[in-house]
Amino acid sequence: MGKTQILWGIAPIGWRNDDIPEIGAGNTLQHLLSDIVVAGFQGTEVGGFFPEPAILNKELELRNLRIAGKWFSSYIIRDGIEEAAKEFAAHCQYLKDVHADVAVVSEQTYSVQGLDKNVFKEKPYFTDEEWQRLFEGLNHLGEIAGRYGLKLVYHHHLGTGVQTEEEVDRLMAGTDPALVHLLYDTGHAYISDGNYMNILEKHIDRIRHVHFKDARLKIMEKCKREGNSFQQAFLQGMFTVPGDGCIDFREVYQTLLKHGYSGWIVVEAEQDPDVANPLEYALIARKYIDRHLLNVPATN
């Protein structure tokens, strides 16, 4: 991958949540971006409440911040490639206009992440024919992303058809490495499979974007016992920032360095901002990164 250059970002989801818009509704764009500067991060991802590019770019330039990417919910299996491609092209135009690097894609056909269903036991599964449609569709979206100077990075996610290590393996095997890359998310890997290193080590050559999401073990176990939905689980505090949960990010970070990873590492943790003050938790993450990751020599 060439010389390692890592950019550190933090996602807006700690301030406001796209799935539950009333959460953190009082946190303005200016408030969010200024908090990110105070916490010492270099950028963020686009939230659902972010404005048109001209307005956003002005706010970013005032604070010397950058945009890493933005989530795109694809429905390739449900709606077909042509419909998904049309929506994705508009998505990529926005990302190009805000000078982003990646387009984050997650196939949402049959997803339960926004439903009142047990996210631990009621995830969807694709048929062989649906997998093939997904492969073809993602390759096509990857071509579109490239035309806009972007990389398509696929987000494995709880409650979707591409969640488990086995499903990530299948996605990587079935798609073109030049067109479809991987967003590696520590929290989703850990909660899904109880292991966050396997996906990283197996697919390091496909990883072009990283989310550092931590998990609170006791709350996760409680949510599993209660059969919580995805939204119920994060509102109870299942997710948190690095340094406040049970994931050892030192091993993850050293592996990324060893393989010459270049790109964004974005801290991301769905939490209720009325319970977990966004700036406070951004600073917890920043302190952990500075003390336990950046001040440790790289291992061979």
Swiss-Prot record:
Cofactor or coenzyme needed: glutathione; Co(2+); Mn(2+)
Pathway listed: Polyol metabolism; myo-inositol degradation into acetyl-CoA; acetyl-CoA from myo-inositol: step 2/7
Annotated catalysed reactions: scyllo-inosose = 3D-3,5/4-trihydroxycyclohexane-1,2-dione + H2O
Primary gene name: iolE
GO molecular-function term, one example from the UniProt record: manganese ion binding
Enzyme class of the recorded protein, top EC level: lyase
Gene3D superfamilies associated with the record: Divalent-metal-dependent TIM barrel enzymes
Position of the signal peptide: none
InterPro entries found in the cross-reference section: IolE, IolE/MocC, IolE/XylAMocC-like, Xyl_isomerase-like_sf, Xyl_isomerase-like_TIM-brl
Keywords in alphabetical order: Cobalt, Lyase, Manganese
GO biological process, one term: inositol catabolic process
PANTHER family found in the cross-reference section: HYDROXYPYRUVATE ISOMERASE (PTHR12110), INOSOSE DEHYDRATASE (PTHR12110:SF41)
Coiled coil feature spans: none
Entry's EC annotation: 4.2.1.44
UniProt name for this protein: Inosose dehydratase
Protein family: Belongs to the IolE/MocC family.
SUPFAM superfamilies named among the record's database cross-references: Xylose isomerase-like
UniProt-listed Pfam families: AP_endonuc_2 (PF01261)
HAMAP family referenced in this protein's UniProt entry, alphabetically: IolE
